[in-house]
Amino acid sequence: MGAPHEEIQALKRRREQNRLAQRRRRDNVRRRLRDLGLDTGSPASASQTSLCSSTDSRVTLNPHQSLRSTDFLSFETSNSDTEMSPYDPPLQSKLRLDSQIPLAEISFPSYASSVSPSSSAGPLSSSPSPSQRPFIDSTDLTSLQSVYNPTSLAVHLDESSMPCGEAEIPTRQDSNFPRTPNLKSLMSGCNDPSAYQPWILTSSTVGEQMSSQALPHSPGPQHCSTPLPAETRPRWTTALHMAVSQGNFSVMRLLLSYGADPNAVNSEGATALHVGVMNGNYTMVAELLQRGADPTLTNAAGWLPLHQAVHAGDEGCVRVLLEADQPVDYPISDLDYT
């Protein structure tokens, strides 16, 4: 019970010290404002506040002085005790009353010297502020002439010869594009609607890319300097290859139980055993071997499944293939070891 009581007493002492420190700050601020004559309770400050709140305030100008700068203008700001922060005494010490500012420090632009002494104060600066600068419309061509150099633009308008609103952007000549004749020659044979024939496409199984088997020859004039690409070789695969490539063990066993050929090849000459070795799934490789997959079959490149496993550094697949009943030391020719 003693320790919490001491902590509560220490907290109360710190709170009282903070309250006294804040009170001393407020007293110092009021004393500083009283010395400057800005305290709202003093008669002098009340008279100054009434002068600042009057709407008919006038500035007496001296026409014989050089009125050039406004850097030394200072204005009085009325702050109450509730709005005054205890951390602003250095800022408030820099404020001066209008009666304390020498007239020599008040300066205006040169054109303000023609204002009569009894008139109200004119503009205080010859250069407009950022908020007073005129807005330049990007659609106005006359205002853009002073900002952009028309000689630096590749395409510009001649406003002297074109009426307003009817100017058109000139197009580039075909000589600037060296491939324009080739494009025209490619499109020259497409003008005859009777020349169009449906393309003959070979559909492959799911997941493979469709390729064009034949393209129609247009009877029109042939001016193309670049021949069309040669016919691509169609690709195909089987459902067993897809199941092995996706690592779906249950679908692979289901396909094998329904009579899928484990030695079927795809368009690259690879069996499902090759695909399993490429994916590094030695469990599926062992299941394929038990279901009758032949490890001596090579792909289109002449590689056995064992060669792919050794090339990939897959110790699990190498061990499963070496433990198979079929011989796996089938030689291959023209093997690129690089």
Swiss-Prot record:
Q: Per UniProt, which keywords does this protein have?
A: ANK repeat, Repeat, Transcription, Transcription regulation
* Source species, domain of life: Eukaryota
Q: Which SMART domains match?
A: ANK
The record, for InterPro entries, names:
Ankyrin_rpt (IPR002110), Ankyrin_rpt-contain_sf (IPR036770)
- Segment Disordered: which positions? 1-70, 112-137
ANK repeats, residue ranges: 235-264, 268-297, 301-330
Bias regions of kind Basic and acidic residues — which residues? 1-10
* Alphabetized Gene3D superfamilies for the sequence: Ankyrin repeat-containing domain
- Segments of skewed composition (Basic residues): 11-33
What name does the UniProt record give this protein?
Answer: Ankyrin-repeat domain containing transcription coregulator asaA
